[in-house]
Amino acid sequence: MKMNYEELKTANATPAAASMVETFRAMGYSLETAMTDILDNSISAGANNIWISRIWKGGQSIITIKDDGIGMNHQELIEAMRPGSQNPLEERSKSDLGRFGLGLKTASFSQCRRLTVYSKKADYKPVYWTWDLDYVAKTNQWELLQWIPDEYINALDDVSHGTLVIWSGLDRIINPETSEIDINSKVKFSSLLDNVKRHISMTFHRFIEEKVVRIFWCEHEIEPWNPFCENEPKTQIRPTENIIGGISVKGYVLPHKVRSLAKQPMLKQKVLMDGQLSKDSMYIEEKDYF
């Protein structure tokens, strides 16, 4: 049945901002998947280098992700900060790893109460905007704040174009009341982020191996970790099978028992990552990207 919208009454049903952002915070992200979602954006923006930093300040600790991608101008940044900024029905380039225009916001909100994005596009002035969930809760409005921590105002001076994502108010990672001298909390914070580093080395191993991007963790370059252990002598590689829809399946059989791990570093890392060699796993990769 064809609708004649001009003859119908309407009512505004704009979602309440304070309630909606709390819903965004509960979309099932772990710290690992949240940070890799941000890295997806950097790669989609054509970054050759990504720098990840963590600054311990107790409950005021900060995590930053900086890239040398194409960057954004003022209007582009506001659009990127808008929830649902991308229509999933629109055609995407094969290098675009996003889909709904929610990842930057939902991934960040799942871990922190304050998301600042500072970006510089070639031939444009640097721009920054912040989502502050405490401000949203207070005003119940979808309003950004033009604010950036003072210590980061010159953070893009060393790149001609790029973007810096700043997470502060990390209430899902650390108690806001935590003291900077709390050693146990500092160790826990470091341990959580070490897990993220390992996750990144696995999730983006193809990108790193193919030299699509270099990822630096606290100034040290992350090495790729290939979960298939293809270069290990005792790994059995099965023939590739092509199935419906252009999907190909390839099997890898790793040694059942842990032997001579010192001589087989990838297997040793497999034990550290998975906990056991006998664990069956399936990995889905967007191979056409490369």
Name every feature range the model reports, one short phrase each.
Residues 1-58, 75-78:
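Bergerat-fold GHKL ATPase/HATPase_c domain
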Residues 55-57, 68-70, 112, 120-122, ...:
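An acidic- and aromatic-residue-enriched active-site/binding cleft used to recognize and process polar
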Residues 73-75, 169, 174-176, 224-226, ...:
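Short helix/loop capping segments that flank catalytic or ligand/cofactor-binding pockets
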Residues 90-219:
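GHKL-type ATPase core
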Residues 185, 189, 197-198, 208-290:
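GHKL/Bergerat-fold ATPase module in large chromosome/replication-associated machines
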